[in-house]
Amino acid sequence: MEEHKPIAIHKREWSRTESIERIASRFFIVGEESTGRYSWVVEARSGFSNNDAITLLNNELRELGLVGSLDPRDPPVLSVTERRYGSGILPSWQLGSVWAFSIIMMVFAGGEWAESVGLEGNPYAQSSLFYALPITATLLLASELKRRLNRKAGIESGHLIPLAMPQISPMWWPFGIFGLFGQKSAEHTHVVNRKELAKIEISVPATLFLVGQPMFLVGLLMTPSTPPLELSSAPLAYHGSILPNLFSSLMIDSDHMIRLQWIHPLGLAGLSLSIMGWILMLPIPGLPGDRILSAILGRERHVEMTTQNILFVLSLGVLIAVFVSSDFIPWLVIATIACMRRFGNDQLKPPMIINLSDGFPRESLERYSAAAVMILLLGLPGMSPASEYENWDAGLDPNLWPSS
């Protein structure tokens, strides 16, 4: 009969501190205790980088409801805290219902616009093909890209949730889609390092911007220079950002400003995506732009009172500038939210970075910083991205127009 080796049993039960220290010692050489309940000065064992060691340790700690993080000191200090879970992921049928509802709203909004600009054919069929479909496909692409990046980083985030309005409102929101939300709160997620956070957060705004800009230009090329035959009310004039305006002025000459008053639904879809991508890049708590700023500056520097005061003053300055120079209500609402969230009770915190010891590689830091600035500058929509054309019927005698 085969003999089994006896199992060594400790004479006393380990405390929780000793248990965590023993688990950490599999991947780190654990030194003296640091300040904090479960914290030690550590060094990654031979064959492990700090990134590998903290990732493997967190795989072990996940079952215990704990998460470990490394601070930027040299040697780093390992701190273990309770894992924050937040809300769960929506079931597939609920998520599908929200997407279906938003797509229907897009079809209605695009159909109304297609009818107002005199597009031939059924307006809702034109809307489905040239407005709802391009927007939905781009949003799905951005959502899937972010979901895969999150999954690669060990984060279960699910797909994004879009919200859209059923009409193009010149006063409240003239772009149809007005919201794109994540299912999981950022402050309840744990990202391995600052570079990974920047990569995840820039994925959606960059996708919307890079797809939306050429889509807007193609839609502008498809727009006729002559007005709709049944123009009975003031046209809604859109104002594009720098890149498409520059290219369209070279390709269409001076007609591009006229075409913006009855732009093709495909152009409106591209403009809507570009505007949404630009808004998501703004450094407002809760938006990807603020989390990208946290990745670039570092969480500790980002949440410092000095940094928060500077951001608040900038937000307040923008709010005053918008109030004085623009009558575009959405900008006023967004600037107000930016000020309120910066120091409000419901301030949204950026994700927890579990490995601050490696910092942000300089080359990658410059690349992501440049990308963020480029999107903000090239996508700048101006104080009034859309406005009703004043005195559109000046010099015309409506009494001579045929009536139905």
Regions found by a protein language model. Give the residues of each.
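Hydrophobic transmembrane alpha-helices and their immediate loop junctions
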Residues: 1-404
